[in-house]
Amino acid sequence: MDQSRMTLGRFLAQQCPQDEKGKALALLLRQVGDSCRRIADAVAGGALREMTGAADNVNVQGEEQKKLDVFANDVLIEGCNWGGTVAGMASEEEDDIYTLPEGEPRGPWLLLFDPLDGSSNIDVNVSVGTIFSVLPAPDTGRDPVNEDLLQPGHRQVAAGYAVYGPSTVLVLTLGDGVYAFTLDRGQGEWFLTSSKMKVPEQTAEFAINCSYQRIWPAPIKRYIEECLDGEEGPRGKRFNMRWIASMVADLHRIFTRGGVFLYPADEKRPNGRLRVLYEINPMSMLMEQAGGEAFTGKERALDLQPEALHQRSGLMLGSREEVEVLRRYYAEQ
């Protein structure tokens, strides 16, 4: 694909089907892109826009919300609740499904999102991001109910994230490869900068929060110990550890240069910590489209059948060979 000044809008016009649903999908993803641009401006402004610090609210997860969590959530809802693109939305920050205002046409898609992943890093100026997923809506034209959103990840038609770092990058898949767009702040436009991104099959880098080591399951303890044994150990090579504590930032590094990201279920959180609908499903779709794998500790991540809007699970994803090693260790336990 010719990347010479390919805008997000032009890309979507070429890649989405030209029927009614395809045009609605293209518009929805442009709406998401516009919303992420607004969020990027707010993140960059930080304290100058009074966007740092807590919002004095607690979300459905029991987590203290940051001011930017609330702002990003509102921006995505306001940016995508018009134009007949969605039948409804769900957010990590909301208790229930968002129902469209009366009079707005119900569209063919459902939008699910984590409006600001890694928001605990905002006040220390570390990269954060937005994660999103698109699922088919019921064909009835009615407002969706919870069960309509409880679809396994392999039913996603699109997924992506925006990372708000030194540059702002939007990474997207429509089920035919992974593409990255960089925001030109001067023009306020997303331009294609990477096509058909691939995660290397082999790696010598892992990302995990080692503060949970005492409560890790046996397969994770074994895997990390063998990585740390270096050339003298059973893996026969030296591994490096990376951990940013921002899923989008950690995985963007892996999409760019390889690695494996581990956030397993453990003794304290036997059901895991990551949200299936808002984090695991979209990131797993992107990872498989980039040639990697995603595994929950029990099954392929995209085959997990969610049973609740805010269900959690463990997750290991990244370079194919490392995820296969982890699959084997879990099978042997």
Curated annotation (Swiss-Prot):
Alphabetic keyword roster: Carbohydrate metabolism, Cytoplasm, Hydrolase, Magnesium, Metal-binding
One annotated GO biological process: fructose metabolic process
PROSITE patterns: FBPASE (PS00124)
Subunit organization: Homotetramer.
UniProt-recorded name of the protein: Fructose-1,6-bisphosphatase class 1
GO cellular component assignments: cytosol
Binding site for Mg(2+) 2: 114, 117, 279
EC number(s) on file: 3.1.3.11
Binding-site residues, Mg(2+) 1: 92, 114, 116
Binding positions (substrate): 117-120, 209
Listed cofactors: Mg(2+)
Enzyme class: hydrolase
Primary location recorded for the protein, binned into one broad class: cytoplasm
Cofactor, free-text remark: Binds 2 magnesium ions per subunit.
